[in-house]
Amino acid sequence: MQRGKKYRAHKEKVDSTKFFSIDKAVELAKSTSYTKFDGTLEIATKVNYKSLQNIRGTISLPHGTGKKIRVLVFCKGDKQNDAKAAGADFVGDTDLIEKVAGGWTDFDACVATPDMMKDVGKLGPILGRKGLMPKPKAGTVTTDVAKAVNELKAGRIEYRPDKGGVVHLGVGKVSFDNTKLIENIRTVVQTLMRDKPSDAKGEYLKTFSISPTMGVGVKVDVKELVNTSI
C-alpha cells in the first residue's frame, strides 16, 4: 500500500529494525503522530496460544483512554436510579430495547441486569456485531450496575485477539504525558500475563508494538517490557 508524504517523512524517525524500551517507544510513537486532532496511542501484541476464543477479559486502565464513553444500561426499578446516579448516559428497559431493535446504537458500552438478559439477548444480531452485547465474564451483566458504569467510565476496556492472535487496544491519547501512557501500557501487560491460560507454553506475548492513530508503528522489546511490568 502506497503511503502518503507525511507518513514517509515521519517514518524516517524510527529505525524499523530495532526494538525499543517502552519509554523510548512511547516517545517515538508520539513524535510520529500527524493528525490535526488528538489521536489515540494504540498497542498491538501477538499472543502465543492456539485456542484464541479462550483469550478474553477486561482491563482497567489507571488513567483511562481519554475517550468519553457513552454507557447504556438495561435495568428496571431502583436499578435505574442507581445507573443514572453513577453517570449512565442511557437507562431504560423495554423502551430502550425497542429503540436498539430499530437499529439505534449511539453508545460505546452496554450493561444489563440478569433479569433483562432474556429480552436483551434478542438484540444479539445488532449488539453482537458491534461488540456491545453484555457478558457476565466482562462484568457487564450484573446486579451492581453502578459499579459497572463507574468502571466503564473510568476506562475499563474489554480485550480479545483477532483471528491472527493479535490484541489491539487504545491506551490513551497522544496528548497524555508519557508517564500515564506507560503506566496504562504496563497495566495491559500485567493483566494479559495474569490472565494467561495455565497451559500456555513458551513466550506468551510474542511481539509488541505501539502506534498513534495516524503515524508510525514502533516495535517494543517485549521481553524487557514483560520482565519490568510483572
UniProtKB/Swiss-Prot annotation:
CDD domains given in the database record: Ribosomal_L1
Subunit structure: Part of the 50S ribosomal subunit.
GO cellular component terms listed in the entry, alphabetical order: large ribosomal subunit
Keyword Heme among record annotations: no
Name of the protein: Large ribosomal subunit protein uL1
InterPro entries cross-referenced by the UniProt entry: Ribosom_uL1_bac-type (IPR005878), Ribosomal_uL1 (IPR002143), Ribosomal_uL1-like (IPR023674), Ribosomal_uL1/biogenesis (IPR028364), Ribosomal_uL1_3-a/b-sand (IPR016095), Ribosomal_uL1_CS (IPR023673)
Function: Binds directly to 23S rRNA. The L1 stalk is quite mobile in the ribosome, and is involved in E site tRNA release.
Family: Belongs to the universal ribosomal protein uL1 family.
Domain of life according to the entry: Bacteria
Phylogenetic classification of the source organism: Bacteria, Pseudomonadati, Spirochaetota, Spirochaetia, Leptospirales
UniProt-recorded Gene Ontology molecular function terms: rRNA binding; structural constituent of ribosome; tRNA binding
UniProt KW Repressor keyword: yes
Residues spanning the signal sequence: none
Keywords: Repressor, Ribonucleoprotein, Ribosomal protein, RNA-binding, rRNA-binding, Translation regulation, tRNA-binding
Gene that this sequence comes from: rplA
SUPFAM superfamilies: Ribosomal protein L1
GO biological process: regulation of translation; translation
